[in-house]
Amino acid sequence: SFPTRRSSDLVTTEDFGSVLFRFDDGSKGSFSVSQVSAGRKNRLTFEINGSEQSVAWDQEIPQQLWIGHRARANQILSDDPGLMNRDVADSAHFPGGHIEGWPDAFKNMMGQFYRAVQAGAMPDNPQFATFHDGASVMYIIDAIVKSHQQQRWVRVEY
């Protein structure tokens, strides 16, 4: 049975959204957001599927990366810094098996930002969100809204 309504307040925000997208190279994708999935709280998952492999990550078990294969056994990679590529191993602050997650990602990003400020120069390939990144997200959101309003595919205009 369903619980009784706890409040008579009318909710006027979007509770669920689903977006279809396609890239210039023809590849397609989708994503969904929900504020009504009971028990999921702030869950964030990514899954990318290709013809030969898939990869999935779940914020509720952030120390694991699942890799699915078509022709061999699937894999679950763990977060052991000793096994990571040197480019990303510095972002792991604890030994393998200890959970690092959402707050750690922001700590790592801000650490990179502060190092750039201290150096007085923007890196060629910044490892933190830039104003350009934020603007790009806003252009994408604008295209999603226009697509919904016009009920057709809309190109993201930068």
Describe the residue ranges of each PLM region.
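C-terminal helix-rich "cap/oligomerization" subdomain common to oxidoreductases
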Residues: D58-I61, H98-G101, N108-Y158
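Short, small-residue-biased leader/transition segments that mark boundaries at the very start
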Residues: S1-S7
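NAD(P)-dinucleotide binding in Rossmann-like oxidoreductases
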Residues: D9-G17, R22-N108
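Residue-level marker of intrinsically disordered, low-complexity segments enriched
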Residues: F2, N74, R86, M138-Y139, ...
